[in-house]
């Protein structure tokens, strides 16, 4: 500890390792005014001490950019919550670059400091952890507010709902949110995906059909291998051939390019898919993990596809 630090710590009563002290110090360093109403009364004294310490040291002032400002804003908010803050402006710069300027949830361009729902914001991927480099993502204010304290099952439940009048996000945006966090979260337990899809049979239908429509993907192979002991292999193979044959012969409803209406317009294929759905539901525990993978591999637009009436 330097003589300066010893003086301010032991004589003046400053706690230089205190986050409130650091926040005050950085306010001076970044040439920002202190506003008492932004801090809790219990932190205000240490914030002022930090500001005065920087002033006494005649710390060189820096021009505050949006990254420095955002980090300081987060650190200030975390004085009350007690969350860990270990991110830097460089971490935010790297995360923003990954987005290419678009919110990965709403797919809308970011705005900055405009007090809009499209403004950029920093979200904690895992709500139980703090602001550390491997636990942050840049999303819009709109997406961040919609997520709130939601866990992954809640996001999926929103994604499979056809219409939620109380939601600020579309069904597709909920799907993109679920996929975004699914790829970043470390799951410690199953999501009970089969149970979620049981209450949305239309989505379960789409998930299963897509495995037959694109049978050569890795996840489709896994799905078929789990299904095989409970369903005649010949039934699976014939259903795949039937779907592909109808596609090649042009027996498909206009604008239906995902195989869904191909099945609806074929009584044989429809009966086969119904059998497969029943087998999945009967052995739900074995399908939970692969159904989650298959669900998030769906093209987002598939969720919005309306079925055509059989011809």
Show where each model-derived region lies.
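Extended, amphipathic alpha-helical scaffolds
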Residues: 275-311
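Generic N-terminal leader segments that precede the first folded domain
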Residues: 1-2
């Amino acid at each position: 500890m330097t003589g300066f630090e010893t003086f301010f710590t032991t004589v003046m009563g400053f706690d230089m390792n205190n986050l409130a002290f650091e926040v005050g110090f950085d306010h001076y360093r970044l040439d920002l005014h202190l506003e008492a109403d932004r801090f809790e009364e219990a932190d205000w004294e240490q914030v002022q001490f930090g500001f005065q310490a920087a002033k006494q040291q005649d710390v060189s002032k820096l021009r505050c950019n949006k990254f420095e400002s955002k980090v300081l804003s987060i650190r200030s908010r975390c004085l009350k919550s007690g969350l860990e803050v270990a991110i830097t402006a460089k971490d935010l710069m790297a995360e923003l670059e990954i987005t290419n300027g678009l919110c990965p949830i709403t797919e809308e361009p970011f705005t900055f400091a405009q007090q809009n729902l499209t403004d950029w914001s920093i979200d904690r991927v895992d709500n139980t952890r703090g602001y550390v480099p491997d636990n942050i993502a840049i999303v819009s204010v709109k997406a961040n507010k919609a997520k709130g304290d939601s866990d992954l099952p809640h996001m999926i439940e929103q994604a499979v709902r056809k219409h939620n009048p109380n939601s600020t996000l579309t069904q597709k945006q909920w799907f993109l949110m679920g996929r975004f966090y699914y790829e970043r979260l470390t799951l410690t337990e199953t999501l009970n995906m089969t149970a979620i899809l049981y209450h949305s049979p239309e989505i379960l239908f789409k998930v299963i059909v897509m495995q037959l429509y694109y049978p050569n993907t890795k996840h489709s192979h896994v799905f078929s291998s789990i299904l095989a002991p409970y369903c005649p292999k010949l039934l699976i193979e014939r259903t795949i051939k039937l779907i592909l044959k109808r596609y090649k012969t042009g027996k498909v409803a206009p604008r239906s390019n995902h195989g869904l209406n191909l099945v609806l317009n074929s009584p044989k294929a429809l009966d086969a898919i119904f059998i497969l759905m029943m087998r999945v539901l009967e052995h739900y525990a074995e399908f939970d993990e692969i159904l989650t993978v298959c669900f998030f591999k769906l093209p987002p637009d598939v969720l919005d596809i309306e079925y055509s009436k059989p011809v």
